[in-house]
Amino acid sequence: MPNGKPDPASLSDRQRRILEVIRDAVVLRGYPPSIREIGDAAGLQSTSSVAYQLKELEKKGFLRRDPNKPRAVDVRHLPETESRSSKAATQAKSKAPQAGVHDPELAGQTSFVPVVGKIAAGSPITAEQNIEEYYPLPAEIVGDGDLFMLQVVGESMRDAGILTGDWVVVRSQPVAEQGEFVAAMIDGEATVKEFHKDSSGIWLLPHNDTFAPIPAENAEIMGKVVSVMRKL
């Protein structure tokens, strides 16, 4: 990252548009847009093209990537623009109720978390071919670390309040503590269960009496569940 304040004069028209889209979203709703939203607004057809532009903006000092979180992007510097849309966003914010509105500097503490779809055998969970989308999530809710999201399928965790269709945010780590909810890989499929270890071995426990505990000796712990999200 360059030293000192980023230079807006170094931006291309497209990069300026991307930052404008990010800035307007932060002002209006308190968090940045998704990768797909950025692409739609900037005329980029693929998420890889958006990712390339974000990387260029990182080099110029407008965004920051944590080397320990290769799939996360923290929005750090948003140039003050005088575009018509930016002025409209600022005016809309001034007219909106202030309760619950976040300071843009605080809203900048946001990571784009990859949504993982089908998982290729042997590949890392956040390998490019596994990622379907990125979602911006506030750090105060999901914490830090190398994060990814999985959608829950099935009712095995119903009694813990984790339902089919929910999204779980997972922090990548190869180990777990007793009683923690984890995402684990078993026979090529991801599952969410409670981690349990006793004299009889290691188990992945469901929270639904109609499901049986799963022996976990051959399971791969992908990470700890840190948040659950649900669309109402």
From Swiss-Prot:
Residues 35-55 bind DNA. Residues 61-85 have a biased composition (Basic and acidic residues). The record marks 121-122 as: Cleavage. Keywords: Autocatalytic cleavage, DNA damage, DNA repair, DNA replication, DNA-binding, Hydrolase, Repressor, SOS response, Transcription, Transcription regulation. It catalyses: Hydrolysis of Ala-|-Gly bond in repressor LexA. Pfam families: LexA_DNA_bind (PF01726), Peptidase_S24 (PF00717). The active site is at 156 (for autocatalytic cleavage activity), 193 (for autocatalytic cleavage activity). Residues 86-99 have a biased composition (Low complexity). Homodimer. HAMAP family: LexA. Represses a number of genes involved in the response to DNA damage (SOS response), including recA and lexA. In the presence of single-stranded DNA, RecA interacts with LexA causing an autocatalytic cleavage which disrupts the DNA-binding part of LexA, leading to derepression of the SOS regulon and eventually DNA repair. Belongs to the peptidase S24 family. This is LexA repressor.
